[in-house]
């Protein structure tokens, strides 16, 4: 099984295991994304779950948000942006107003998704998921097939049913949100799903 190691983030293209190559901070991408999140959601605290090196966390903090990051990759956490070393960690039990999960759930095996979502409900009651969409176990955006850890390739209806089965209420679904993943939207307008959800108990 491939893990999220140094090779995954720094040499993934050459080694044919991911789309990453010398994964670095790009403020021209991360700060507009952070502003879009700030403008679309009401929250005091937020967590980027699956934050990798914490670039979105850094951007959110730059614009004044109380943002945190969690990731299962020890390499990513240990090599996070220096500005957020005190704010990025391995998964923990903290609770936040908003849980952001961008390009993460496709890495989770189908049978494990319910337990992951149950864990998310312990961490927040408001969720923003960005997920590459697929049909017949193929991503609509073929470039996403490069990543060997991309194992779940489902369409928007499948995801909505999954979320609802775990007690999450769909607030809004769309194929875009501001500048987030904008380079993919023009060539692939239905390639990514943007899901805004809350717990049914809210």
Name each region found by the language model:
Residues 124-134:
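Conserved beta-strand signature within the Rossmann-like core of class I S-adenosyl-L-methionine
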Residues 162, 166-168:
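A structural motif corresponding to the C-terminal end of an alpha-helix
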Residues 102-107:
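Short catalytic micro-motifs in class I SAM-dependent methyltransferases
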Residues 119-123:
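Conserved helix-to-beta-strand junction in the class I
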Residues 1-100, 111-118, 134, 146-158, ...:
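Conserved N-terminal segment of class I S-adenosyl-L-methionine
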Residues 137-143:
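A short acidic, helix-capping loop that chelates divalent metal ions and anchors anionic groups
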């Amino acid at each position: 099984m491939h893990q999220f190691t140094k090779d995954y983030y720094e040499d993934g293209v050459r080694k044919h295991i991911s789309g990453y190559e010398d994964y670095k901070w790009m403020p021209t991408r991360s700060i507009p994304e952070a502003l879009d999140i700030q403008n679309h959601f009401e929250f005091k605290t937020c967590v980027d779950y699956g934050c990798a090196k914490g670039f979105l966390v850094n951007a959110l903090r730059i614009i004044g948000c109380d943002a945190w990051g969690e990731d299962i990759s020890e390499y990513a956490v240990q090599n996070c942006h220096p500005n957020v070393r005190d704010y990025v960690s391995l998964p923990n039990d903290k609770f936040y107003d908003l849980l952001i999960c961008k390009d993460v759930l496709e890495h989770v095996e189908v049978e494990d998704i319910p337990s992951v979502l149950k864990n998310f409900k312990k961490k927040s009651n408001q969720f923003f998921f960005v997920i590459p969409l697929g049909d017949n176990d193929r991503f609509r955006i073929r470039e996403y097939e490069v990543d060997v850890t991309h194992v779940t390739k489902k369409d928007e209806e499948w995801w909505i049913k999954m979320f609802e089965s775990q007690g999450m209420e769909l607030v809004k679904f769309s194929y875009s949100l501001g500048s987030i993943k904008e380079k993919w939207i023009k060539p692939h307008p239905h390639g990514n799903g943007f899901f805004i959800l809350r717990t049914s108990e809210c």
